[in-house]
């Protein structure tokens, strides 16, 4: 589900609040504001960003440390070949695009299980493939599976030419 409404509080407003909150009591708040990103269109995308993007020391997989970081709802316009591969779909909006790895991580909740949605997703994924972008789909169950999330993060780091130095239960 995507929410077309404006956020209740913007990152800019949170940053202003964080500058005002100087007490050590607000250290965690200031850190959270520093790590937050704009552009999420759903709670699941925000959670996915929180699991993958922040540095390892905060319990995430450090994707934001890769060149270009992790961009939420990044638009990729298709070239002519990719447009044909996508059956006329002119562009894709990636839930979370990692430029260094040429990977789009897509959260597919229950809405993506409907037939017309699967057809559209397949077309856009073909277009992205034509642009050299690999699409990694994360479903509801995988969002709760730390071993799966680690494996996905490891593959992203590898595609970016790096190495994830993190281990959970021997993966």
Residue ranges and their predicted role:
Residues 3-171:
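Surface segments flanking catalytic/ligand-binding clefts of nucleic-acid enzymes
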């Amino acid at each position: 589900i995507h929410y077309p409404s404006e956020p209740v509080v913007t990152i800019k407003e949170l940053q202003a609040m964080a500058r005002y909150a100087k007490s050590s009591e607000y250290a965690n708040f200031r850190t959270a504001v520093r790590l937050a990103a704009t552009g999420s269109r759903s709670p699941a995308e925000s959670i996915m960003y929180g699991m993958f993007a922040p540095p390892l020391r905060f319990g995430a997989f450090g994707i934001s440390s890769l060149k270009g970081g992790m961009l939420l709802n990044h638009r990729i316009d298709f070239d002519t070949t990719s447009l044909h591969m996508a059956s006329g779909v002119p562009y894709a909006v990636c839930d979370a695009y990692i430029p260094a790895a040429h990977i789009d991580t897509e959260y597919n909740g229950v809405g993506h299980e409907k037939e017309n949605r699967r057809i559209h997703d397949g077309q856009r994924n073909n277009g992205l493939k034509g642009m050299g972008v690999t699409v990694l789909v994360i479903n509801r169950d995988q969002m709760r599976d730390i071993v799966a999330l680690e494996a996905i993060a490891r593959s992203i780091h590898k595609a970016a030419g790096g190495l994830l130095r993190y281990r959970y239960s021997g993966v």
